[in-house]
Amino acid sequence: MRNFSLSYVEKYAPSRQQIKTYLLKKYLKQSISSVKKQNIIDLIDVVLSDLEKTKFISDKFYSDSKAKNLIQRGTSINKIRNYLISKGIQDRYIKETINKINENNEDQDFFSAIKICKKKRIGPSRTEVNRPLFYKKDISLLARNGFDFETSKKVMDLKKDDYLKIINLL
């Protein structure tokens, strides 16, 4: 079991919960009649605690690295929070990561929304003629990406010149 978990860690750099799910699926598929399910779960917990002691897995590191990666892609803070929750990261690590993001950049959502606009070619990156036609559609796209209404409106109301200046800074 330790070998399976080490190969999985080497390949994917997962969170604790992801390894636990992987090992449960792997060993419950085999359905060995002589071994009870509770024994498998206990063994998995022992392997996971051993991996944490040897620093092969760390939910804090996972949380920080995934958040950094998602920010570079232009993901909102709400979406990052929900992603980390879905991966089984503890609340304290999520709060630390979000606080670290806010310390580094006060208005991170604004810059992430700008990145989304550039990538999807919406909002201020559209031609001036088409912007009013697609306003609602663009606002809803930003909302689906986890941005609040104020941030979306602030980005959508940017002038083309200001938008280009910000893009050059990013």
Q: In which residue ranges do the predicted regions lie?
A:
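An alpha-helical, amphipathic repeat domain used for nucleic-acid recognition
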Residues: 1-170
